[in-house]
Amino acid sequence: MINEIKQDSEKRMKKTIEALHSDMSKIRTGRANASLLDHVMVDYYGSPTPLSQVANITTSDSRTILVTPWEKSMVAAIEKAILNSDLGLNPATAGTAIRVPMPPLTEERRKELIKVVRHEGEQGRVSIRNIRRDANNQLKELVKEKAISEDDERRAAEAIQKLTDRYISEVDAVLAEKEKDLMEI
């Protein structure tokens, strides 16, 4: 029972870290990143479709994303979708491919993005602490039902606290890396 609680907690904490990585990859730094356009939706014959399903997205260099549509007729729709996204990007069509240069971030925009990054990091920490609280409540419930002793509960709670500390330090590392990325010019 105790091992199940620990394993469940660890699995949930890992998912929190994965979600944090996913959220961080969507926040634009000055560097080109193909995953930046993942959430851009294109009007594909009347239905909104993710850009990654109608085009190949690659980075041609550190400051340019190259979007190659699978259908030539989609070039205009893709360009419009990128322009209308909230990313502040200006795509340029070059024949059948679309080049998306990454404009350098202004100091003001960097500070805004750092606030967003810190908020996301705090959400990750809160989520991990909530998982710890749930695990501790499950342990207390087992003690009430006399399924485990108080000593077992204490040992399990300490193990869960170690897990919590490890994953919170991982959140801090992800946060520090993203802040460093944002401050690079």
Curated annotation (Swiss-Prot):
<dbReference type="InterPro" id="IPR023584">
    <property type="entry name" value="Ribosome_recyc_fac_dom"/>
</dbReference>
<dbReference type="InterPro" id="IPR002661">
    <property type="entry name" value="Ribosome_recyc_fac"/>
</dbReference>
<keyword id="KW-0963">Cytoplasm</keyword>
<dbReference type="GO" id="GO:0005829">
    <property type="term" value="C:cytosol"/>
</dbReference>
<comment type="function">
    <text>Responsible for the release of ribosomes from messenger RNA at the termination of protein biosynthesis. May increase the efficiency of translation by recycling ribosomes from one round of translation to another.</text>
</comment>
<dbReference type="GO" id="GO:0043023">
    <property type="term" value="F:ribosomal large subunit binding"/>
</dbReference>
<dbReference type="GO" id="GO:0002184">
    <property type="term" value="P:cytoplasmic translational termination"/>
</dbReference>
<protein>
    <recommendedName>
        <fullName>Ribosome-recycling factor</fullName>
    </recommendedName>
</protein>
<keyword id="KW-0648">Protein biosynthesis</keyword>
<dbReference type="InterPro" id="IPR036191">
    <property type="entry name" value="RRF_sf"/>
</dbReference>
<comment type="similarity">
    <text>Belongs to the RRF family.</text>
</comment>
<dbReference type="Pfam" id="PF01765">
    <property type="entry name" value="RRF"/>
</dbReference>
